[in-house]
Structures are given as C-alpha cells and as structure tokens.
Amino acid sequence: MDKEMKLLSRKLAKIRGWIQAAATLLTNIHIPNLFKGKIYQGNAKTVCVPGLNCYSCPAATGACPIGAFQAVVGSSKFKFSYYITGFFILLGVTLGRFICGFLCPFGWFQDLLHKIPGKKLSTAKLKPLRYLKYVILIVFVILLPMLVTNSIGMGDPFFCKYICPQGVLEGAIPLSIGNAAIRSALGKLFSFKCMILIAVIVLSILFYRPFCKWICPLGAIYSLFNKVSLLKITVDSSKCVGCGQCSKACKMDVDVCKTPDHPECIRCGACIKACPKDAICYRFMGKSCQKNDNR
C-alpha cells in the first residue's frame, strides 16, 4: 500500500466541502457586481470554467462551457467550438467527473440543500432517469443549436434558455435585483425557469444531486471519460472484505467494488471515508494505494 496516497485520499475526501467553496468563489470572483446588476465582460470571459456556472452571473469569472458550446456548435463563422471540444476532452481525460464532485458550483449548491434536515429519499430505483441527461445533451446542447442559429451565425442556447436553473439562480435573479430595466423585462420564460429552479431545490433536499444525476449535460460529457481519466478511484482487492460499506455510502448509486470508475461516480470520496479496511483511494496517473492495481 502506498501510505502517502492513502492518507492524501482521505484528507482530500475530508476537506471536499472547503474545496467546493473555494472553487465556487474562484469561479465567481467579481462579488461586487452582484450588487450593481452588471455582468463582468473582461478578457477572462473568453475562458471557460470547468463546472456549470452561468455566464450571465454578475460575479462570474469566466464562461460556462455548455453555454459557449451551444453558441458556436452550429456556427459557420466561428471555430471556437474546437477550443470548447478540446477543453472538454482535456478536463475529461484528466479529471473526469471529479469536476462534478469538487469544482462545480451548482453541484455544491445541491450538496448544501441536501444537508437540510428532513426525510431523504433514495434514487436507487430511479436509475433509468440517468439517461435523460444524455438525451438533453444530444437534443438541447448539440442538435437544436446546430439547426437554429441567429443572424450572426451563433447557435441559440436552448439548454440555457429553456432548462438550466443555474441561469436563474446566478444570472436572472441577481441581475434583476440590481437592474430595474432587466427587472421590468422579465416575463413568462423567467417564471417558467423559476418553476424549474424551485423544483430542483425541492428535489435536492429530498434526493441527492437530482440535477447532476438526471439533467446536467456537462456531467454527461465528463461521464464519458470516467473510465479513461487520469484521476480514478481504485479498490485494493487484497484488502477488500466485501462488506459493502462503500456502496452504501455512495449517494450516486454506484457499486464501488464492481465498477469504481462508473460514469456516475463523481469522485466525492464518500466510499474512501466509509471503507473500514482503507482499501479504497484515489489513483492519479497510475499511482494508487496499492502496488499492483488490477481495478
């Protein structure tokens, strides 16, 4: 066993909440803009952030990768989609859904909501809903923006406009509070999006990360790389006693022993903390908590 990697894995899992808070702050560094009703439009907005974070948030540091991809996926004038595609591949191959578990502001928002005391419901019997996010990715993020473009050749961001609750939470609400013109322009679409946001909030209190599991197209993209990403979860078969504590602790409904690199795994580290034998740890670029890793 590599003791250093094992200790690092447990420490990383233990401080995940602090890392999520720091990532959210760095992703939304322009805090004063929240009170001005203005969107930051500096050079950093040409760079995408790793998690789901609305471009229209007054505090946003960079661009949302899903929003940016929709804008140019069907464009005949811009080649920015090659950058976005490369961005997805680079982060996916490097970290996989670790981004969902540690670096996504909306993922952290759902985690905080789920900590609210009350009855919690399992999503174990709702696994077929996992595939909905792939349908949303294909239809609302790729196909519709490719087919419907505006006069300057930019794709219409269907997911951002009609589905994404993050846009209301981070964009429309703070902008309307600080900007009377925007407030007066709000209409039925805003009301519809508010209903989606409220539904996600209620579901997040009852279920663990429903948006991540069933709706998020960014999570769908990163999930495609989970099996090949440099950062993985590894199980030491020589230490594992098959007690199943890791799978019981996994709120993403993953059988950790059988499929530690399952597409739904967000690398949150709950299984690492739950294992009574210290048989589970992170693996990066082949370095793990066991010398001969067969999983």
Could you say what each language-model-derived stretch is?
Residues 1-257, 263-295:
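Non-ligating segments of multi-cofactor redox enzymes
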